[in-house]
Amino acid sequence: MNHDVMNIFNPAAEGPSFDRIRIALASPEKIHSWSFGEVKKPETINYRTFKPERDGLFCARIFGPVKDYECLCGKYKRIKYKGIVCEKCGVEVTLARVRRERMGHIELAAPVAHIWFLKSLPSRIAMILDMALKDVERVLYFENYVVIEPGLTPLQPFQLLSEEEYMEAQDEYGEDAFTAGIGAEAVREILINMDLEAECAKVREDMKETGSELKLKKYAKRLKLMENFLTSGNRPEWMIMTVIPVIPPELRPLVPLDGGRFATSDLNDLYRRVINRNNRLKRLIELRAPDIIIRNEKRMLQESVDALFDNGRRGRVITGANKRPLKSLSDMLKGKQGRFRQNLLGKRVDYSGRSVIVVGPDLKLHECGLPKKMALELFKPFIYARLDAKGLSGTVKQSKKLVEKERPEVWDVLDEVIREHPVMLNRAPTLHRLGIQAFEPKLIEGKAIQLHPLVCAAFNADFDGDQMAVHVPLSLEAQLEARTLMMSTNNILSPANGKPIIVPSQDIVLGLYYLSIEKDNEPGEGMAFGSRAELEAALESDVITLHTKIKARWEGIDVDGNKITKVIETTPGRKMLVDLLPKHAKMQPEMIGELLTKKAIGALIDQVYRHCGQKATVIFCDQIMGLGFKEAAKAGISFGKDDMLIPDAKADLVGATRDMVSDYEQQYVDGLITKGEKYNKVVDAWAKCTDNVADAMMDEISKTSVGEDGRTSEVNSVYMMAHSGARGSKNQMKQLAGMRGLMAKPSGEIIETPIISNFKEGLTVLEYFNSTHGARKGLADTALKTANSGYLTRRLVDVAQDCIITEEDCGTSEGFEIQAVVDGGDVVVSLEQRILGRTLAAEVKDPASGEVICPADTYVDEDLAMAIEMAGVQSVIARSPLTCETRVGVCATCYGRDLARGTRVNIGEAVGVIAAQSIGEPGTQLTMRTFHIGGTAQVSEQSFIEAGSEGKVTFKNPSTVTNSDGDLIALSRNMQLVIVDTEGKERESYKLGYGTKLKVKEGDKTTRGQRLGEWDPYTAPVVSEVGGKVKFVDIAEGVSVKEETDEATGIASKVVIDWRGSAKANALQPTIVVQDENGEPIKLSSGSTASYMLAVGAILSVADGDTVRPGDIVARIPTEGAKTRDITGGLPRVAELFEARRPKDHAVIAEITGRVEFGRDYKNKRRIAIVPEGDEAEKVEYLVPKGKHLTCQEGDVIQKGEYLLDGHPAPHDILAILGVPALANYLIDEIQEVYRLQGVPINDKHIETIVRQMLQKIEVKDPGESTYLAAEQVDKIEFIETNERLEAEGKRMATGDPVLLGITKASLQTRSFISAASFQETTRVLTEAAVQGKEDTLEGLKENVIVGRLIPAGTGAIMRQYQVIADDLDADMLAEREAAVEAEGLPTEIAEAAAEEMAAEEGAS
């Protein structure tokens, strides 16, 4: 007793420490052990006294006292009676807090089924009984009897009997001949009598005997479930409940409102229902009521328990008085408002405030302006403590008064308290980690927070009314972390791409750009200045201008740190910037030798950061910001309407395009082109015209004239703003002074008539109407985009949250090949950029000399990356998170550089979350649009290739035919044109499409810009490889082709139609055969005949009986036919790739290398076989819908991994056929393409990290001697561990293939059930976990946040390591002491005392 009193004022003891959490089914005994008493009455509180009713839902005897240390009747009050149970009212005298943790229970008069295990699919109860869910429900809800024990009767076990059948059976066989039951009792009896081990053995036997795939799957699922029950220690009958727990009353409170009414939690209503029905059932059973009444009551009890656990899962939703569905226990956990996401993963915190932000250009980068009023409120406890320490107040109450009166000494104290105490600023939405940064507060008057202009980019903040929140880190550790990790000065680089994110924008850029302009013939040209002061004097007295070319003295340091001076040619403006550069050997004045656009400034800051370090960069950024603002203000740049110059060439360009368009119209009328082709060509012509007008306008605006005095005129202000990157873009200027161009309909199609006017001229009514159409869609899209982007980020974070750097080096030699990204001869991303900051997996050799540039396992920094690029290396093998062999997490060597720091990554860095944020954050900038034919108004179809460099032409896999004009026509689908230089090195290679007309021959010399080949971008031709007579096969008018007469032109053309609809036409296959003069089909070199199958939509270019020459086109397939598949762009495309969905018309990929053969058709599918060259492999067959355009002909040799059918490939196919590296490359290229289009740079590493998380499962192929089942999906780590165990025991190991899961699926299948439950489908995840008796080892971030521990990343990772080390040391010391005791034979009392001493030490620590 005395001991307790001593401890009363001490803080509560720390909670139990644990390192795993297990979830399982609760047995009735377990529920009783939790409970403090049975709830027998549905009453809550007495309406007059407001005291809880005895034995009711709020009973104080069961759940504990309402007031601290006071029993209900008031006999015992005060702490001295602690622990006594009042003999009058039965309440234990203790803290009222126990009402939050004590549970009760309800004894059910009849068992009921737990709805989660009954209705959560797949139904566990139905599966273990091997019955249909419908049948189980029939039994449970008292519609049918079930035979439990058939005895000697011909009835089957588990057979259902209706009421009549049951009566008849009883009459026929006698009442005791068999047992049948109804309701949950019957099901429970079956489950109790079930012998799981025997049942498992039986299912195993069945699996061996069955031949059907379906049955195998069914057996496997059932076997898995029964094994789960056996291994987890759960009993199947626990899925039927005989007693239900009642949660503590404080968690379902009853709150009095004014006016004598009460607000109550829905759970109380649901519990009341259960108790009422249960009591009524008890009474009916005692009264021996008729069976039918009891049965009805039992069914109602089952329904009320169902509603309590999961309202609305079965039957009608139970609603409250206001027709609103009641929130059941499941709803408490589910969704955004549920326990997981509302209270465990995100909490509201104390010591925080929010206010509007304003710009603070006079702040240093690490400061923010904090309003005094806010600071006073936020730092209250610190102020109280300091006032006390200084002796200005004696008690907390006095301090409070001082602060409330805002006495002068309080402000002095506040200044002291705030000094060097960082605060965190956050702007919602926090899309990446730079959305929260720490600053040192600077007290300001006013009520708005001041923010440094350079951090706006990271916060994505602007000052049009944005608000930000302030948080105060309280503990010393928190302050330390805020200062070292989160300070704005420590976050100069963006974690997404490693480029500086503290980059000037807008006014600053404009000021710096203006400073760096250089002009001819300015006053004072050629003067030389010795010092900064001379220069300023000359500027002040207008002897020179900012743009005059002058000579000046520059002082710097060389490599050894010695001072050097030299004379440089520069302008006064540029000299100011040069003077700001940090003193360093690499910082040369030539760095500021051209116009400073936003990009150039970014690159400059990057250089400063790389060479001079963080501190110098921060100072440099602050200085150029000040300079930029000052000079922009002094320059006084502004613009008026007249600065927008409309180019004179516009009229001619528009006129020329109008002529072209009328040409196309005429061709269409004459029947030379189809409607679709005309549309494509018109859109194309206008798109080109718009671009030409825009270029003419830019030329016009960027021109500067020379005046009579030889001075260059001022640069056009609008051009300056756009060119410097301060504001506006070429696209916006095009709309202001060029022509607005083509507009899109909301569906994404492009309207043929463009908007020829610009905003300066004004739009006509029709043009305005056309433009509103797409503009409105744009606004609607933006709203949807934000939500979609947020959801993508959430899924990404969830799948990657447990990916943490856990060790230095996993020691793998694996890696995957990295090359430069080349698009149409242009290098989009160089090899240098792609390998920077990675670790090489293999040595890199100089392709020319063959000497080793660097060995394997070298970390690639800027210098090495450049050296590799300069040596002309084509590709390197680098390590990647994808190939890392660390069990849990990733190793630092495979990951490489931490992009936000520019150094090797630290252990404990949460790279998964960083990857998710880097990919999700730019999501709002991506478009939502799904482009229809024609793409955007920007994209013109490419219809030719030009040589990008000089060299010699060679062909790979050539297959050509020379047409009547003497041009080569490409006939192979995998033919490549390669240009090699004099040393025989590949300079560029182009894949040639089927039917490309080549302008060069093998061995020709090329010059840069020469046309190499061309094709019609709007149709795919079918080319005859031989000359002869055309014979039509299966081309029947009205069945497989129809003559389409164009209404506009009256010209008829024959088009292949979908013939598969009619029954008799099913076997048709429209084909064009080329015959010789004897009427025999001509044989090709490959051995097949010259016959060409036609796809739906093909337009015939020849008639039956025509003569054709080699290279002639016999039919053409309009490519919108092949391209109507929408080009899913932007966000939906990224989501589609990460979710690993199969695209609608996905490509068919060849699984082996071999020759293509067409087999017998099957229904309306065409059978295609690939026959391998050797004998060892089997041939592979595919069924492809007829009428689809195939990319290969019969007899073609096709390589493994090539497409038989065009389209987007399904990622699963790539993984299965070509393996992980090919899949990774495909996903990286596709995802990066979307981001590159929007100009968002993201490092490949992030995408690789997410893909790694998508490949965490393995599908078992051969289980070996493991307990796995064939085709079962197993966790990769688990699989490796099982195999290691099998190998150690000398057993046969399991084999399997990696499986690709979409991010949602992967999140739901993580090893941690807590993480999965907090993501989506909470009930399903928890049901599954409970049946399996899963353990959560708390490895990821989410589960640790939920249970309230330090996350195992960053400082938390280190703390965890120390903990493990400390535990081991303790164990060793104890062992040593015991050994010593045994050796010396000390008396046991001393040993016990020593042990107690140890325990006390442990407790104290």
Curated annotation (Swiss-Prot):
Transmembrane spans: none
Pfam families tied to this protein: RNA_pol_Rpb1_1 (PF04997), RNA_pol_Rpb1_2 (PF00623), RNA_pol_Rpb1_3 (PF04983), RNA_pol_Rpb1_4 (PF05000), RNA_pol_Rpb1_5 (PF04998)
Superkingdom classification of source: Bacteria
GO annotation, biological process: DNA-templated transcription
Molecular function terms from GO: DNA binding; DNA-directed RNA polymerase activity; magnesium ion binding; zinc ion binding
EC code: 2.7.7.6
Binding site for Zn(2+) 1: 71, 73, 86, 89
UniProt-recorded name of the protein: DNA-directed RNA polymerase subunit beta'
Taxonomic lineage of the native organism: Bacteria, Pseudomonadati, Pseudomonadota, Alphaproteobacteria, Maricaulales
Gene designation per UniProt: rpoC
